[in-house]
């Protein structure tokens, strides 16, 4: 017997094509996995929404701001659209990209102990970015930590320009 998923969740996530930087097959694959993981397990409730989900989320960038366009699964009317400054996330995302580059380089040449140390740092930065994102969203969208982690992954995947 299958369990009915909770209503306050995401049922679809898209990334704005115009916001996505050029990337190879590996990055495309990671984006697809991040979206799949997010849709499999998430808690997502727009603050103050009198209705209930499930919701669709379109993530993009506009005027150097993160745009979260939230709609109901059924219907095209927006529930809410949030525009968030990227400034608070910039440093952690930049550091995250740098450590990811080190991690991918280490996979080819470093010892397992070195790879593990870099990976621990990578996960720590990912957690830091997720906590910061969750804090930035708290008055707009209620998300649990795992959902914030998956959203942070997708925000990083945008490889915003500039």
Curated annotation (Swiss-Prot):
NCBIfam families: PRK02853.1. This is UPF0262 protein AZC_3148. Pfam families: UPF0262 (PF06793). InterPro entries: UCP032146 (IPR008321). Belongs to the UPF0262 family. The lineage of its organism: Bacteria, Pseudomonadati, Pseudomonadota, Alphaproteobacteria, Hyphomicrobiales. It comes from the Bacteria. HAMAP family: UPF0262 (MF_00678).
